[in-house]
């Protein structure tokens, strides 16, 4: 369990509690979680972070009424900057989106601007929002992570408790390699409810070669670990940077959706550009 699981900053969250579902607009439903809760124990300081990146959200259950009362539906794409003070707590995001359901807006741009304003206020950081009509996305192919999948290894695993021990001496040789490794076996658990979070992860790096068995064992050790998606990605980035010391590193995870939302955080210290196409489990 994370050291800050019972932190007072989490006490007021609706996550894990019985809640009422409102269908008229209410920005106060949004709740933020300080990024510092995870970053402080990792020694990460807001003014000297070793990465950049965003939290990419896809909104699949977004609906409101137009000025004449006709329901509208859209798929939303949200990007929250890594520099924001808070991350957005996902259940509160779902409840907030539900509050649009019986609310009239004059046009689509008013909806987009409202989302952008409220999310920016909650996160205390930069947020961008794009809305897509369904016919704009119909026929969009299922994406995949480019890279070499490390999952099909004939190894025995009997420990599922998080540890960085597997990354000790995980690099070999002096030759510098540049490769992209992929695993679909990432599974962690919600910090509050301990419900499972399922994801695929892409690790792109340049440096001494990382032992794939040790890397896979490390990733599997998240199986009983309780943290939010964004926190897991930053922990993985920080651990790889610390133990493997690559010249360049990018870590990108795409998680399956829950409550009509999926969260896809990435962190990088290079010119990494994430693919935003949904994966087969999304």
UniProtKB/Swiss-Prot annotation:
Binding site for substrate: 88-90, 229-230
Coiled coil residues, start to end: none
Residues that coordinate or bind NADPH: 90-91, 258-259
Localization of this protein: Cytoplasm
Enzyme Commission identifier(s): 1.7.1.13
GO BP, sorted A to Z: queuosine biosynthetic process; tRNA modification
CC terms in the record's Gene Ontology section: cytoplasm
NCBIfam families from the UniProt entry: QueF
Protein name, entry field: NADPH-dependent 7-cyano-7-deazaguanine reductase
Natural source organism: Escherichia coli O45:K1 (strain S88 / ExPEC)
């Amino acid at each position: 369990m994370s050291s800050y699981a019972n932190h007072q900053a989490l006490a007021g969250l609706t996550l894990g509690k019985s809640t009422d579902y409102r269908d008229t607009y209410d920005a106060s439903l949004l709740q933020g979680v300080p990024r510092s809760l995870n970053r402080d124990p990792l020694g990460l300081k807001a003014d000297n972070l070793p990465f950049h990146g965003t939290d990419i959200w896809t909104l699949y259950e977004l609906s409101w009424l137009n000025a004449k009362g006709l329901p509208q539906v859209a798929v939303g794409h949200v990007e929250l900057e890594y520099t924001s003070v808070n991350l957005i707590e996902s259940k509160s995001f779902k409840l907030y989106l539900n509050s649009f359901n019986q609310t009239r807006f004059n046009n689509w741009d008013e909806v987009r601007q409202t989302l952008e304003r409220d999310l920016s206020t909650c996160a205390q950081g930069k947020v961008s929002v794009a809305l897509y009509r369904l016919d704009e996305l119909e026929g969009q192919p299922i994406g995949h992570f480019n890279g070499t999948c490390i999952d099909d290894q004939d190894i025995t695993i009997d420990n599922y408790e998080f540890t960085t021990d597997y990354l000790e001496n995980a690099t070999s040789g002096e030759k510098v390699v540049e490769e992209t490794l992929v695993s679909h076996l990432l599974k962690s658990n919600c910090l509050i409810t301990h419900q499972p979070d399922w994801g695929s992860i892409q690790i792109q790096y340049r440096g001494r070669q990382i032992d794939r068995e040790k890397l896979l064992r490390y990733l599997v050790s998240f199986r009983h670990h309780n943290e939010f998606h964004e926190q897991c990605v930053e922990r993985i980035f920080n651990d790889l940077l610390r133990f493997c010391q690559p010249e360049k590193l990018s870590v990108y995870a795409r998680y399956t959706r829950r409550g009509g939302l999926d969260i896809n955080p990435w962190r990088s210290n290079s010119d990494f550009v994430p693919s935003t196409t949904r994966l087969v489990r999304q």
